[in-house]
UniProtKB/Swiss-Prot annotation:
Membrane topology summary: Multi-pass membrane protein
Family: Belongs to the G-protein coupled receptor 1 family.
Organism whose genome encodes this protein: Pan paniscus
Name recorded for this polypeptide: Probable G-protein coupled receptor 33
GO function terms (MF aspect): complement receptor activity; G protein-coupled receptor activity
Record topological domains on the Cytoplasmic side: 54-64, 125-143, 231-246, 304-333
Gene (name only): GPR33
């Protein structure tokens, strides 16, 4: 995965390092770096607070368990933002070494896959709870949710391994070090055969990432919530619309925030430096930062009257947001 560094494979020796951010104006680079630093500070504090409340101050339910790990995926993503910002300020020079280069890319991939997988799991959980209440009463337990959580982390880690392997540091002739993908895992950067291999692997990685990390979860979530919405409209199962609003907010925020990333990665395949490529890169950095920082806050405040929110304690707000909907659990199909 590439947010700041867009170099994936090489066309010829004169374009040994192709990085779209080289074309960014200094003001744009400063805005991106400042946004990343601020997002890192805010995200660490807010997401850390949310995790503490969900883990130690609330009863462990399927809801709280799934949302805890969803927010944990966002918290992990905030840990890499300072590295992105520092590299951005140094014109994408990477001075943290090869090991951190690999960890950086692997963590970025892990954060993306886990967040979308947990959003899908939350959608499936709501689908089962609403349309299969009898099965849910018998099987939908924190232990069952723990197995789902374990499966999500294992799947996301497995899908992130290639990006951990392919990521390497590259030294150009001017002494600049970049953290970039070397899909052929070869030190022969100028070989035409290796360039062609890198291109094919890059295309394969893009397609698999787009299908598994975006398109398939999108269809799963759309199916689940279409069925849930139909059932809710038919029987008026929920006491309030808050649970549905919380999940829809999580879904919309994720797809709005990650869509620019996939568009940017698709544009990279065209190998054309353009204003659109530059704009999508800036938008990608800003929206993914927003996703990791503000999405958890939206879960808490959506559907609430702000005057009431500010009068509530943090714990009461969490309990109101993530409480199980008992009316759905009791409904029989």
């Amino acid at each position: 995965m590439d947010l700041i560094n867009s170099t994936d494979y090489l066309i010829n020796a004169s374009t040994l390092v192709r990085n779209s951010t080289q074309f960014l104006a200094p003001a744009s680079k400063m805005i991106i770096a400042l946004s990343l630093y601020i997002s890192s500070i805010i995200g660490t504090i807010t997401n850390g607070l949310y995790l503490w409340v969900l883990r130690f101050k609330m009863k462990q339910t399927v809801n709280t368990l799934l949302f805890f790990h969803l927010i944990l995926s966002y918290f992990i993503s905030t840990m890499i933002l300072p590295f992105m910002a520092t590299s951005q300020l140094q014109d994408n020079h990477w001075n943290f070494g090869t090991a951190l280069c690999k960890v950086f890319n692997g963590t970025l991939s892990l954060g993306m896959f886990t967040s979308v997988f947990f959003l899908s799991a939350i959608g499936l959980d709501r689908y089962l709870l609403t349309l299969h209440p009898v099965w849910s009463q018998q099987h939908r337990t924190p232990r069952w949710a723990s197995s789902i959580v374990l499966g999500v982390w294992i799947s996301a880690a497995a899908l992130s391994i290639p990006y951990l392997i392919f990521r390497q540091t590259h030294h150009d002739r001017k002494g600049k070090v970049t953290c970039q993908n070397n899909y052929a895992v070869s030190t022969n950067w100028e070989s035409k055969e290796m360039q062609a291999l890198r291109q094919w692997i890059h295309v394969a990685c893009f397609i698999s990432r787009f299908l598994l990390g975006f398109l398939l979860p999108f269809f799963i979530i759309i199916f689940c919530y279409e069925r849930v919405a139909s059932k809710v409209k038919e029987r008026s199962l929920f006491k309030s619309s808050k649970p549905f609003k919380v999940m829809m907010t999580a879904i919309i925020s994720f797809f709005v925030c990650w869509m620019p990333y996939h568009i940017h990665q698709g544009l990279l395949l065209t190998m054309n430096q353009s204003l659109l490529l530059e704009l999508t890169l800036i938008l990608t950095v800003l929206t993914t930062s927003f996703n990791t920082i503000f999405s958890p806050t939206l879960y808490l405040f959506v559907g609430e009257n702000f005057k009431k929110v500010f009068k509530k304690s943090i714990l009461a707000l969490f309990e109101s947001t993530f409480s199980e909907d008992s009316s759905v659990e009791r409904t029989q199909t």
